[in-house]
Amino acid sequence: MCTREAVRMSREHDLPEIPSRRLLLKGAAAAGALTAVPGVAHAAPRPAPYENPLVRQRADPHIHRHTDGRYYFTATAPEYDRIVLRRSRTLGGLSTAAESVIWRAHPTGDMAAHIWAPELHRIGGKWYVYFAAAPAEDVWRIRIWVLENSHPDPFKGTWEEKGQVRTAWETFSLDATTFTHRGARYLCWAQHEPGADNNTGLFLSEMANPWTLTGPQIRLSTPEYDWECVGYKVNEGPYALKRNGRIFLTYSASATDHHYCVGMFTADAGGNLMDPGNWSKSPIPVFTGNETTKQYGPGHNCFTVAEDGRSDVLVYHARQYKEIVGDP
């Protein structure tokens, strides 16, 4: 985490093409920001690029485009003590949109420190926020927690604390994301597996409800390539995108300095997602720092849809400098 990260956006044509079959560079998808234009013989005009950074001093961005046509933005605040929310009719409008605090850390006990990586989801007519937090007395005992709000407007109503997401182990865990596929809801997250020679790997489980796992949890990935093990052996920050008969799962790797980067898995949408053998992992990162643009350590991304309702947009955090003083 970093108090000086900035949220940025990119479209498909802003990113270099990666020569790997596992990145699905055919059809209507490409590495980074993906564009889905089914049934169109000629490419649609490309919208103007976004102005970066979109939001300063925020990390781990998440943007939800709601059925009301508005974009809802949340991210890690640099003080790690609250969950914030903004909304706008346009993606660019999030830069200047008013920000509200929808929940604050507890003064003591659980959910009191390291409030990280919130994600806002609309599930079954209610709003949910997944986030990481730790007790005041043990700030690295980080776990995954869930908030629920039944009001149609997430800026109103009451955010009820549904509790901790209980995984197979009581160990360091964070960066939960959720998605549905073929009638089932899944949770994907990062966690330290007892006895493993790494900081965190990626895990997947089906859900009984928005705060409870059900059935087995599987290990999708552990840091194995050199680019996943710089500084720390880390796989974290997963996010899913379903397009063109495949499921793309991006994630972040290595220490959260300028070596931080994005990797990716793909799975056939017709396969069993709970079978690790159905997922293919890219042996190279799909998004890294860039000296030309002076963007370093891109990571913990999400995907949203542009105002045209068709173009997928990659939202990520990065820095404009390499050297870090203090907490990275």
From Swiss-Prot:
Its main location: secreted. The keyword rRNA-binding does not apply. It is found in: Secreted. Optimum pH is 7.0. The enzyme is slowly inactivated above pH 9 and below pH 5. The record marks 175 as: Important for catalytic activity, responsible for pKa modulation of the active site Glu and correct orientation of both the proton donor and substrate. Predicted to be exported by the Tat system. The position of the signal peptide cleavage has been experimentally proven. Residues 1-43 form the signal peptide. InterPro entries: Alpha-L-arabinofuranosidase (IPR016828), Glyco_hydro_43 (IPR006710), Glyco_hydro_beta-prop_sf (IPR023296), TAT_signal (IPR006311). One of its GO terms (molecular function) is alpha-L-arabinofuranosidase activity. The keyword Ligase does not apply. Optimum temperature is 50 degrees Celsius. The enzyme is inactivated at temperatures above 40 degrees Celsius. It catalyses: Hydrolysis of terminal non-reducing alpha-L-arabinofuranoside residues in alpha-L-arabinosides. The active site is at residues 60, 236. Belongs to the glycosyl hydrolase 43 family. This is Extracellular exo-alpha-(1->5)-L-arabinofuranosidase. It comes from Streptomyces chartreusis.
